[in-house]
A protein has these predicted regions:
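Conserved short histidine dyad/triad with adjacent acidic residue
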Residues: 84-94, 100-110, 118-136, 170-173
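Alpha-helical residues within the helix-turn-helix
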Residues: 19, 30, 59
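Short, conserved beta-strand element in jelly-roll/cupin
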Residues: 122-124, 135-151
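Short acidic-glycine-tyrosine-enriched beta hairpin
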Residues: 107, 154-169
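Short alpha-helical DNA-recognition segment
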Residues: 22-41
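Single conserved hydrophobic/aromatic residue that forms the stacking wall/gate
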Residues: 1-11
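DNA major-groove recognition helix of helix-turn-helix/homeodomain DNA-binding modules
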Residues: 52-67
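Ligand-binding loop in jelly-roll beta-barrel domains
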Residues: 100-103, 161-162, 170-194
Length: 194
């Protein structure tokens, strides 16, 4: 799997879309609520954005989240074979401090005009304990396939084991991570309105 290709596409597509719409980095930062430094670091392929900033950027640019991840657009149903789900894009859960935290395997990357983003996510162990909560418009569904996940949601924390699931409004500040430095695997579906 060539992860760097997928990662390069994210920063190239963001910059291209921003320039096509004649939006400056300053405007994108202001309208998305993100730091200008973060936008610059993403566009220079220094940092990999987590889903929350990417969703905010997509909304400002008037595109769906999948625009950053797609290879092609299919109008009809999209079948994702097991071998196709092995291609991954790695995201950090905090773009300023970390280069990689989760590997996202898109299950719908060629579906045109979608509002849901289904992923199998390999969650890497982390020693971090001071997680920065993020929020964005939409909803998320997570089911644990392997390991134990800890979901910080508002002022509450939930431990989910294999087979457990959670569905929440992502406008509430949240953070998803593996429990106590262990690896885990989840099925996640992110819904973002356009």
């Amino acid at each position: 799997t060539d992860r760097s290709r997928g990662l390069g596409d994210v920063y190239k597509r963001q910059k291209s879309l921003r320039e096509d719409k004649s939006i400056t980095i300053e405007e994108l930062a202001q309208r998305s609520g993100l730091a200008m430094e973060q936008i610059e670091r993403i566009e220079n392929n220094i940092d990999i954005p987590s889903l929350a900033p990417l969703i905010k950027i997509a909304r400002v640019l008037g595109v769906r989240l999948g625009t950053f991840l797609d290879d092609q657009d299919e109008v009809g149903p999209v079948v994702c074979r097991k071998k196709e789900a092995k291609d991954a894009i790695s995201f950090s859960n905090n773009a300023i401090h970390s280069r990689k935290h989760m590997e996202y395997h898109s299950l719908s990357k060629s579906k045109a005009d979608r509002h849901m983003e289904p992923f199998i996510i390999d969650v890497m162990p982390t020693e971090d304990t001071d997680f920065v909560l993020s929020s964005h418009e939409g909803e998320e569904f997570i089911m644990v396939m392997e390991g134990i996940m800890e979901i910080s949601y508002g002022k509450n924390t939930y431990l989910l084991e294999e087979g457990d699931s959670i569905y929440y409004d992502s406008i509430v500040p949240h953070h998803v991570h593996a429990y106590e430095g262990q690896a885990a695997k989840i099925l996640a579906v992110v819904y973002t309105p356009i």
